[in-house]
Amino acid sequence: MKLYSINTGYFKLDGGAMFGVVPKSMWNKINPADENNLCSWALRCLLIEDGNRLILIDNGNGDKQDAKFFKHYYLHGDDTLDKSLAKYGFHRDNITDAFLTHLHFDHCGGSINREGDKLVPAFKNAPYWSNRAHWDGAVHPNDREKASF
């Protein structure tokens, strides 16, 4: 079995929202905030090569949303899912299983691609795996989490 770290880019979120009750004086040392209290976060996935299976755990935020959506997240960096897969000699069509830890946009937004006016699965040779609780939460989100879907 081989494991690969797959970086799909970076985005920014409010440090206080991410670290909660942990004082800024502590978290700011390891993840410094900018002038708007935003911290950079890696959109990193895990690729598992096991025999003839290539399992992708999460897939980043993708690019199907519009500019209005993404302007809130300050996307930066040159990494993409396709570039990171290619670095190890793989293509998205090689993925045999797409596992989603949960259904927030930054973990599963790359599951679907826009082709013209249609949305199509990004991994055409892979079933998608998650669980019922996450599906129900995404379809019927609570007020606190609905912006994440």
Residue ranges of model-derived segments:
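Extreme N-terminal starter segment of soluble prokaryotic enzymes
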Residues: M1-K2
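A short secondary-structure junction signal
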Residues: A67-K68, G110-I112, V139-D143
